[in-house]
Structure formats: C-alpha cells, structure tokens
Curated annotation (Swiss-Prot):
InterPro entries in UniProt: PRibTrfase_dom (IPR000836), PRTase-like (IPR029057), Xanthine_Guanine_PRibTrfase (IPR023747)
GO-annotated molecular function: guanine phosphoribosyltransferase activity; hypoxanthine phosphoribosyltransferase activity; magnesium ion binding; xanthine phosphoribosyltransferase activity
Principal EC category: transferase
Classification via Gene3D superfamilies: 3.40.50.2020
Protein name: Xanthine-guanine phosphoribosyltransferase
Residues reported to bind xanthine: D92, I135
Short name of any one Pfam family annotated for the protein: Pribosyltran
Substrates-to-products reaction catalysed: GMP + diphosphate = guanine + 5-phospho-alpha-D-ribose 1-diphosphate; XMP + diphosphate = xanthine + 5-phospho-alpha-D-ribose 1-diphosphate; IMP + diphosphate = hypoxanthine + 5-phospho-alpha-D-ribose 1-diphosphate
Gene Ontology annotations for the cellular component aspect, listed alphabetically: cytosol; plasma membrane
Length: 152
C-alpha cells in the first residue's frame, strides 16, 4: 500500500450519519448485522441514528493455508438477510463481501469506504478510496503528543 487515508472519529460519525439518512425510513429494517470487527463501530453508529435495537454480528476470519487466503465463518446471524442491513467499514478486494452476499443474499449490504475492486459488491457506500490506499481507522490509532518542530 503506497498511500494512507486517516479517518478521525468525527469523519466516521459524519459518514455514518450520511449512510443512515439514505436508509430512511428506519421502520423498513428488521435490524443490523455488523461484520466483525470492522463493521462493529459503524454498526453501533447506524443503530443509534436509525433507532434500531436488533443488532447481530457475523464473524469472519481470514487465514493463510498453502499460500491461499481462505475465509472461515466463526459466527453467523441466522436467516437470509431479508429486511436487514449488513454493514462493514470497508469493501476492499471483495473476498469478504462475496462471502457475505452468499450468506445474506436478501440483505442490504453497505460500507463506509469502498475501493474499486469491491465497489460492485455493495449496495451503498459513502467514500471512494483508491485501491492502493491503506485506511487507518480511529479505533486502530491512539492520540499522542507531538512535539513542535522547533523543539521549543
């Protein structure tokens, strides 16, 4: 990855609210399925904005086996996704998104960020990100003091 895109808590909340406004009226949704772990925080923000209390998770792990990347479903929400929003923070190459689509073919699948390779796999997203860009999410960063350049 050659570039970095830094996401602040404020930016994340603004993007989540933008997605929530597109999902109105909220009564059309039975609940939210957050993809662990990246979709947990966006899922909580959406649940708040839409007044949705039924929140579930799907937990997927990727691991290397004979130099191939495989996905393992650790936990899934029941059903085919009808009436549910499935949310993740990002769609990148589309590997996880393909698995989600297979598990929940009737769900409305959304992300905050989308890279070109995965973009066709989601129903909605907020921010376009170049494929070679690494996203630094606020939950992966700490706030630290940075001394002035002058040293004074």
């Amino acid at each position: 990855m050659s570039e970095k895109y830094i996401v602040t808590w404020d930016m994340l909340q603004i993007h989540a609210r933008k997605l929530a406004s597109r999902l109105m009226p909220s009564e059309q949704w039975k609940g939210i399925i957050a993809v662990s772990r990246g979709g947990l925080v966006p899922g909580a923000l959406l649940a708040r904005e839409l007044g949705i209390r039924h929140v579930d998770t799907v937990c997927i792990s990727s691991y290397d086996h004979d130099n191939q990347r495989e996905l393992k479903v650790l936990k899934r929400a029941e059903g085919d996704g009808e009436g549910f929003i499935v949310i993740d923070d990002l769609v990148d190459t589309g590997g996880t998104a393909v698995a989600i689509r297979e598990m929940y073919p009737k769900a409305h699948f959304i992300t905050i960020f989308a890279k070109p390779a995965g973009r066709p796999l989601v129903d909605d997203y907020v921010v376009d990100i170049p494929q070679n860009t690494w996203i630094e999410q606020p939950w992966d960063m700490g706030v630290v003091f940075v001394p002035p350049i002058s040293g004074r």
